[in-house]
Amino acid sequence: MTTISPDYQVIVVGTGFSGLGMGIALKKAGINSFAILEKADDVGGTWRDNHYPGCACDVQSHLYSFSFEPNPSWTRMYAPQPEIKKYLQHCARKYGLMPQIQFGQEVKKAIYDEQNKLWRLETAAGKTITSRMVVSGMGGLSTAAYPNIKGLNTFK
């Protein structure tokens, strides 16, 4: 049996705290065969997407950061959205993640290929990317995709 080599060992989806944190952890572990797929044109997740008046974190700033990258420069106890977004941009650059991030790649499907033991991710841009592992860092504010299971709509 011929095995197909995946494009990457790991695909991370999203560039909020979860996705960037995973990317940093992979680099620290010496795993460099990974990509981070991001639907938008910049990092930041919810802190990039939400910018209404008064948008801020409801967790104290010193706790709302990576333990390995404290930010002593928060201007308020509860950081405003622009500062959090800037912090995430700083982390992505400082830890060398920018080359691994593929912007404009919204994942529409993730299908596990049993025969080849790899994941096939399909993006809205029509790209197919393969990996051995997938880590979702899309967060709770993303639109969920429900499986097409017979009887799902009538289940009580």
Task: Describe these PLM feature segments.
Residues 134, 138-156:
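Glycine-rich beta-alpha-beta "Rossmann" dinucleotide-binding loop(s) and their flanking helix/strand
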Residues 24-25, 48-49, 146-150:
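Short amphipathic alpha-helical segments
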Residues 27-52:
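Glycine-rich FAD pyrophosphate-binding loop
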Residues 20, 43-44, 144:
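Catalytic P-loop NTPase motifs of RecA-like helicase/translocase cores
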Residues 76-142:
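Feature captures the FAD/FMN-dependent oxidoreductase FAD-binding
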Residues 1-8:
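A short, basic/flexible loop-to-alpha-helix module at the beginning of a structural domain
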Residues 8-36:
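N-terminal Rossmann-like FAD-binding beta1-loop-alpha1 element of flavoenzymes
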Residues 48-90:
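Glycine-rich active-site loop/strand segments that organize a redox cofactor
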